[in-house]
């Protein structure tokens, strides 16, 4: 597998090939996932919950993210590395530029930020200075207190139409990738069809251009709860690398997510 870039992912969308993405937080797992052929690794601020034992992603700092990005970078040869910008690390453009620089210097090839069209100026500023951006709509975990919990988003028509408009605006601002989380499958399909850039779904149906899972869910090592949109691939294989290879295959062939993983 050749080195994956943002251009590679766009080419996959144009060819109708599915993109497989997973989270990782250290060199050892990153190396296994890279060798398995995963297209992109996200160093997610989900580390606050799955590594640190927090009840949300809000306590995660930019220093945490830079540390884990450096760790992942050491294990990766070909996979695209995306790093989350944590809560309040991009509250204004100046702050966003400084913190994105930390993550890029730590080894990221792209940064991910959560939010709608209000981020247009920030995204443009980052892209103009050479920082590729992955946007994130739907259930954005950094806004959990606004949503009143981890809930499916975009179920009523007004909010669905707003999300489509936001997605188009984020693409126009320069975002090169879009994560869609916990939205009805029909909305995931509509947004994907409306955009030129690839969409990566997590609980967003099977018609997005790719899928992403938190590694702890995909490997069945989540402590207390398996999300509806996830599947334990390790249970089917008994081997971590084979589990990720199965995940990639199931996404590629359109078998994952199945109907049982989809929100209506």
From Swiss-Prot:
Pfam families: Pantoate_transf. Pathway: Cofactor biosynthesis; (R)-pantothenate biosynthesis; (R)-pantoate from 3-methyl-2-oxobutanoate: step 1/2. The active site is at 181 (proton acceptor). 3-methyl-2-oxobutanoate binds at residues 45-46, 84, 112. Mg(2+) binds at residues 45, 84, 114. One of its GO terms (cellular component) is cytoplasm. GO terms for biological process: pantothenate biosynthetic process. One of its GO terms (molecular function) is magnesium ion binding. Its cofactor is Mg(2+). Its EC number is 2.1.2.11. It catalyses: 3-methyl-2-oxobutanoate + (6R)-5,10-methylene-5,6,7,8-tetrahydrofolate + H2O = 2-dehydropantoate + (6S)-5,6,7,8-tetrahydrofolate. Keywords: Cytoplasm, Magnesium, Metal-binding, Pantothenate biosynthesis, Transferase. It is found in: Cytoplasm. Binds 1 Mg(2+) ion per subunit. Catalyzes the reversible reaction in which hydroxymethyl group from 5,10-methylenetetrahydrofolate is transferred onto alpha-ketoisovalerate to form ketopantoate. PANTHER family: 3-METHYL-2-OXOBUTANOATE HYDROXYMETHYLTRANSFERASE (PTHR20881:SF0). Belongs to the PanB family. Homodecamer; pentamer of dimers. This is 3-methyl-2-oxobutanoate hydroxymethyltransferase.
């Amino acid at each position: 597998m050749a080195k994956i870039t943002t251009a590679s992912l766009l080419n996959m969308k144009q060819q109708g090939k599915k993109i497989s993405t997973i989270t990782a937080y250290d060199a050892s797992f990153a190396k296994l996932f890279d060798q398995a052929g995963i297209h992109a690794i996200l160093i997610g601020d989900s580390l606050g919950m799955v590594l640190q034992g927090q009840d949300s992603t809000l306590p995660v700092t930019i220093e945490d993210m830079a540390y884990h990005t450096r760790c992942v970078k050491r294990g990766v040869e070909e996979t695209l590395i995306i790093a989350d910008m944590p809560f309040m690390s991009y509250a204004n453009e100046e702050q966003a530029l400084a913190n994105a620089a930390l993550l890029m210097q730590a080894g990221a090839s792209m940064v991910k930020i959560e939010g709608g069209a209000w981020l247009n100026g920030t995204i443009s500023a980052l892209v103009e200075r050479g920082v590729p951006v992955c946007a994130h709509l739907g259930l954005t975990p950094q806004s959990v207190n606004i949503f009143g919990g981890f809930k499916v988003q975009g179920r009523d028509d007004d909010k669905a139409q707003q999300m489509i408009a936001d997605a188009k605006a984020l693409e126009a601002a320069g975002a090169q990738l879009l994560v869609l989380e916990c939205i009805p499958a029909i909305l995931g399909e509509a947004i994907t069809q409306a955009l030129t850039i690839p969409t990566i779904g997590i609980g967003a149906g099977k018609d997005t251009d790719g899928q992403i899972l938190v590694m702890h869910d995909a490997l069945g090592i989540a402590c207390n709860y398996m999300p509806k949109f996830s599947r334990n691939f390790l249970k089917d294989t008994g081997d971590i690398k084979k589990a990720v290879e199965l995940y990639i295959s199931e996404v590629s062939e359109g078998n994952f997510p199945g109907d049982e993983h989809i929100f209506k």
